């Protein structure tokens, strides 16, 4: 299949050109569903959340299936300029690496299996899932794992920009939306009364000063702040979104407790805070010595690639947190993830697809 990389890139760009912000992946899901049908996959369906499923039957129905997933959604709003810039060694476009090339790789695996006449022992389920990013809270993958359960060979999660990495540890994440309420007023005549904007700014400063351990790696971030009415108004309402992460669940729980206590003590008679949990990503881990992790390592080495064992917050969090075998492998390298300057390197795609094909074929041996 001499033009395989070009075909894969062409499909990735077709996918990338369909806006798919989290919670609005429908049109992209419809496109993938149509392509699954065109490719002749069996039992093609879309569930109530928008996850798309298609089965490549194996020779033995008694063999547990392999689930290969790639998330449909992107971090970019619907009206984002999705223009593509092609260069000799890379393709730049919002969402091309995270995760359009990952979704395209589902088809790439299928094409390579057929081109090389590889018939697998068990079924392979290709899944394009929703709600991986941000406030999606992994609800798509939670539904996928609920659907298939533990009677699987493994969950293989494909991420476009992760080539060379094996994600076998899932970090825990807690997310909050904190809203301050005050009486508000005029910036001159009511000066001295609390402003909700000032209150959240002071609180964020306190949160950012919480000491965090380097090991286990632990982070705190306020990614969004909103509120206020005008430049000369004491804001009656303002809010911020808080993201807490750690490789260790007990450390995460301690950080969450500290943050919640700071929020509680920031309240005053004239200032009320509402706290809403907007995301909880479960943690889990598969040993670096697990046979599937060792297999993934071998597959990368066969492509002449160095291996980095990695922790992260991905769709693999869900099965790993439930004690099921799962890991993340990548398609290529690149950079600028979650920015409009996102890009993928084109040369490593063949190596990336080579390791994915070897992993899928070897899983059933």
Language model feature labels by segment:
Residues 2-92:
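Acidic/His- and Gly-rich active-site-bordering loop/insert found
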Residues 72-86, 152, 168-179, 327-328:
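Acidic-glycine-rich active-site phosphate/pyrophosphate-binding loop
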Residues 106, 158-183, 187-190, 196-203:
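Phosphate/diphosphate-binding glycine-rich loops and adjacent basic-rich segments that engage nucleotide
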Residues 188, 195-365:
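Metal-dependent amide/peptide-bond hydrolase catalytic core
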């Amino acid at each position: 299949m001499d033009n395989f990389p070009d075909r894969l890139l062409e499909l990735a760009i077709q996918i990338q050109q369909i806006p798919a912000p989290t919670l609005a992946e429908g049109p992209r899901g419809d496109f993938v569903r149509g392509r699954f049908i065109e490719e002749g996959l069996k039992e093609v369906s879309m569930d109530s959340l928008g996850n798309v499923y298609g089965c490549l039957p194996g020779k033995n129905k008694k063999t547990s299936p392999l689930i290969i997933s790639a998330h449909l959604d992107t971090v970019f709003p619907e009206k984002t300029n999705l223009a593509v810039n092609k260069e000799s060694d890379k393709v730049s476009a919002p969402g091309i690496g995270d995760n359009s090339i990952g979704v395209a790789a589902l088809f790439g695996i299928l094409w390579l299996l057929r081109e090389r006449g590889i018939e697998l022992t068990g079924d392979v389920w290709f899944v394009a899932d929703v709600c991986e990013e941000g406030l999606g809270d992994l609800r798509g993958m939670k539904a996928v794992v609920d659907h298939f359960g533990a009677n699987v060979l493994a969950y293989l999660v494909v991420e476009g920009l992760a080539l060379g990495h094996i994600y076998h540890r899932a970090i825990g994440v807690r997310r909050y939306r904190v809203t301050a309420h005050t009486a508000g007023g005029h910036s001159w005549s009511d000066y001295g009364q609390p402003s909700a904007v000032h209150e959240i700014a002071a609180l964020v400063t306190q949160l950012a000063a919480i000491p965090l351990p380097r090991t286990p790696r632990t982070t705190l971030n306020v990614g969004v702040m909103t509120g206020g009415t005008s430049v000369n108004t004491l804001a009656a309402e303002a809010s911020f979104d808080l993201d807490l992460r750690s490789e260790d669940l007990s450390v995460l729980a301690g950080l969450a407790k500290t943050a919640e206590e700071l929020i509680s003590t920031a309240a005053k008679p004239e200032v009320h805070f509402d706290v809403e949990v907007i995301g909880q990503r479960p943690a889990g881990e598969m040993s670096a010595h697990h046979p599937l992790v060792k297999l993934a390592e071998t597959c990368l080495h066969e492509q002449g690639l160095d291996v980095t064992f990695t922790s992260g917050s991905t769709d693999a969090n869900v099965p790993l947190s439930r004690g099921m075998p799962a890991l993340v492998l990548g398609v290529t390298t690149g950079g600028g993830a979650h920015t409009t300057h996102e890009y993928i390197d084109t040369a490593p795609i063949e190596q990336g697809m080579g390791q994915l094909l070897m992993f899928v074929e070897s899983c059933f041996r």
